[in-house]
């Protein structure tokens, strides 16, 4: 793993310190990306595969420990080095327990930094299996059912090619995880993975997001912006919910795919792009074509290779390992010593229909961990939709007044359910910071 091939992400809210580290690391032959807070770091880690993350421990909004845990949750294989002042060595020890590979004392000794980086990267090489870790293991795709094995086999076959991939499946089945695995296992893995949910934007905003815009192209366009195609140049562009785009956007997207070039909104300049396209939808695009709602020529361009996502109800044997996987994740995050599920609770999970698929299972397990006061998750902690019968409230005395902390937790959990588990959006809707939301959940 030579310096020219190594990508390092530096995370520090001290911009001057970031700049110094960037210049230093580049001088040693590394490629360097910067993030000025934890949220930026998570965005970058989701978009690109880094060989190492160098993260400060003291940052506003999301500190280094929380950033470390989120990175490790997303991809446990990324080595993370923590930077800390003398006064916070105890916190650095906590970081090691949370998965950090090592820590460095600030102000940094540059010789020590160079040695630690070399050792960390060497450790990473040695820890890699001769057989490359499966995309499933890297991105949390858990299960050994026939349907899951077939899915993983498809990923292994398709990933090395540059073919356009259409992922079809119900909401919550893990289409984005498959896109990430395809990118990470491809020759483009060192280049960006850019993700865009087409259903989240109206036509004009989607056009600007995809192709970029010139300054003054429309009201509010105060500077030129590159689109997602240009951002993904050399890498992979994942377009989720492609079946929801308008007829006009279908025409523009078709041209971009056919010609491998785009134009910013408000510009006549043509930009060549080298992008592997992965698209996903919950719709049956063949039916959409028959109904005249989706262009046949675009459908053929997208449908080069199809990967069908099995719904969770079609692979019930994967529910126990998935539930245990999420249990471990959220028990660690909430610092709870949870031993597992009662047989009755697991039986309910296995036999529930899961209309929201894996996402619904994850949310149910997270909710159960947050509400749990004992060692085993029982039907009491599971949502009413799963148990099928109301679970009696825990006694609070004759006046039946819930403690405020429980009321707050219920409000937070309700907000999380409505935002699909998005903690940042849930915090915004509740009028609190993300850090406050996480603190209240962990009580």
From Swiss-Prot:
Phosphorylated by ZraS. It is found in: Cytoplasm. Part of the Zra signaling pathway, an envelope stress response (ESR) system composed of the periplasmic accessory protein ZraP, the histidine kinase ZraS and the transcriptional regulator ZraR. The ZraPSR system contributes to antibiotic resistance and is important for membrane integrity in the presence of membrane-targeting biocides. ZraR is a member of the two-component regulatory system ZraS/ZraR. When activated by ZraS, acts in conjunction with sigma-54 to regulate the expression of zraP in the presence of high Zn(2+) or Pb(2+) concentrations. The gene is zraR. GO terms for molecular function: ATP binding; ATP hydrolysis activity; sequence-specific DNA binding. The modification 4-aspartylphosphate is found at residue 56. Residues 7-121 form the Response regulatory domain. This is Transcriptional regulatory protein ZraR.
């Amino acid at each position: 793993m030579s310096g020219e091939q190594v990508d390092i992400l530096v995370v520090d809210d001290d911009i001057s310190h970031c700049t110094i580290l960037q210049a230093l690391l580049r001088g040693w032959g590394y490629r360097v990306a910067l993030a000025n807070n934890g949220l930026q770091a998570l965005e970058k880690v989701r978009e690109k595969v880094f060989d190492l993350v160098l993260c400060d421990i003291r940052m506003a909004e999301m500190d280094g420990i929380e950033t470390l845990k989120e990175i490790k949750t997303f991809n446990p294989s990324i080595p993370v080095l923590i930077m800390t002042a003398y006064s916070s060595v105890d916190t650095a020890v906590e970081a090691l327990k949370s998965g950090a590979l090592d820590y460095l004392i600030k102000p940094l000794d540059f010789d020590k930094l160079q040695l630690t980086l070399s050792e960390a990267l060497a450790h990473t090489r040695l820890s890699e299996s001769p057989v490359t870790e499966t995309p499933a293991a890297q991105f949390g795709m858990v299960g050994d059912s026939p349907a899951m094995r077939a899915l993983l086999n498809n990923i292994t076959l398709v990933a090395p090619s540059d073919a356009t991939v259409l992922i079809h499946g119900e909401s919550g089945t893990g289409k984005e995880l498959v896109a990430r695995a395809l990118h990470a296992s491809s020759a483009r893995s060192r280049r960006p993975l850019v993700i865009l949910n087409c259903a989240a934007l109206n036509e004009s905003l989607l056009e600007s997001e995809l192709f970029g815009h010139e300054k003054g192209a429309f009201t509010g366009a105060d500077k030129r912006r590159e689109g997602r195609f240009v951002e993904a140049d050399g890498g992979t562009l994942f377009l989720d919910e492609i079946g929801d785009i308008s007829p006009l956007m279908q025409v523009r997207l078709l041209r971009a795919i056919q010609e491998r070039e785009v134009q910013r909104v408000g510009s006549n300049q043509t930009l060549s792009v080298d992008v592997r396209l992965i698209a996903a939808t919950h719709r049956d695009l063949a039916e959409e074509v028959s109904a005249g709602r989706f262009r046949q020529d675009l459908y053929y361009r997208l449908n080069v290779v199809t990967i069908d996502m099995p719904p969770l109800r079609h692979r019930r044997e994967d529910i126990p390992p998935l539930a245990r996987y999420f249990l471990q994740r959220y028990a660690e995050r909430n610092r709870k010593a949870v031993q597992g599920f009662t047989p009755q609770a697991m039986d309910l999970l296995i036999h529930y229909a899961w209309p929201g698929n894996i996402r619904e299972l994850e949310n149910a397990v997270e909710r159960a961990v947050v509400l749990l006061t004992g060692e085993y998750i029982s039907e009491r902690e599971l949502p009413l939709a799963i148990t099928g019968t109301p679970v009696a409230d825990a006694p609070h005395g004759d006046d039946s007044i819930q403690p405020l902390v429980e009321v707050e937790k219920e409000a937070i959990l309700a907000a999380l359910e409505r935002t699909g588990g998005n903690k940042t959006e849930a915090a915004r809707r509740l009028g609190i910071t993300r850090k406050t939301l996480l603190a209240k959940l962990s009580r």
